[in-house]
C-alpha cells in the first residue's frame, strides 16, 4: 500500500483549498514545527512513502531544507551541551554514516563503526549524567573496549549512566 501525508509551510500568509490559515498538516503534532522536521518525522515512521505540502506557498528556505532530505536515512538535530573536541566532532558527524548495531537494544541505538576508526584516539570523560530519551553520547576512555561507540537513548531508567550496564526491563 503506497501512502502519503501532508506537512505545512510556516511561511506567512499561506493558504489551502479552503479558508484556513493555520496550516494543513496530517499530524496535529506537526503544527508550527519546522517543515523539514515534519518531513523527517514522517519518513522516520517508515509508514509514509510520499510527503506533500498542504498549503501554498512554502518559502525558498523551506523548499531547500526539504530537498536535502533522504527518505531512507534517519536524521535529526542535536543540541550540544558542550563544545566538542575534534575527535568527538568526527565521531558525531562520521563520514561513513552511523548504523544501529545488529544486536538491537530497546534502550539505545548504538553505532560502533567509529570505534575502530578512533581506537587510538583519546576521548576524555565529560558530562557524565543520567540519560534521558533522545540524549546522544560517545563512550570515552573509561570504557576502552567500547570507546568511540555513539549511542542515542531510546529509553533509560533513572540512575543509569552510559557504560554501567543496561537496566532490566520493567
Could you say what each language-model-derived stretch is?
Residues 1-82:
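Catalytic alpha/beta core domains of metabolic enzymes, predominantly
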Residues 83-170:
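C-terminal functional modules
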Amino acid at each position: 500500500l503506497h501512502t502519503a501525508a501532508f506537512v505545512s509551510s510556516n511561511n506567512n500568509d499561506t493558504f489551502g483549498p479552503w479558508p484556513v490559515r493555520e496550516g494543513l498538516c496530517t499530524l496535529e503534532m506537526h503544527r508550527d514545527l519546522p517543515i523539514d522536521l515534519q518531513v523527517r518525522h514522517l519518513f522516520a515512521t517508515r509508514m509514509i512513502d510520499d510527503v506533500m505540502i498542504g498549503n501554498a506557498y512554502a518559502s525558498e528556505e523551506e523548499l531547500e531544507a526539504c530537498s536535502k532530505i533522504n527518505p531512507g536515512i534517519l536524521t535529526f538535530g542535536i543540541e550540544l551541551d558542550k563544545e566538542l573536541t575534534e575527535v568527538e566532532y568526527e565521531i558525531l558527524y562520521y563520514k561513513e554514516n552511523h548504523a544501529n548495531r545488529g544486536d538491537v537494544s530497546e534502550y539505545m541505538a548504538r553505532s560502533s563503526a567509529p570505534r575502530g576508526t578512533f581506537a587510538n584516539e583519546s576521548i576524555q570523560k565529560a558530562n557524565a549524567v543520567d540519560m534521558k530519551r533522545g540524549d546522544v553520547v560517545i563512550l570515552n576512555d573509561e570504557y576502552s573496549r567500547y570507546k568511540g561507540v555513539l549511542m542515542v537513548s531510546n529509553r533509560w531508567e533513572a540512575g543509569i549512566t552510559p557504560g554501567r550496564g543496561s537496566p532490566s526491563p520493567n
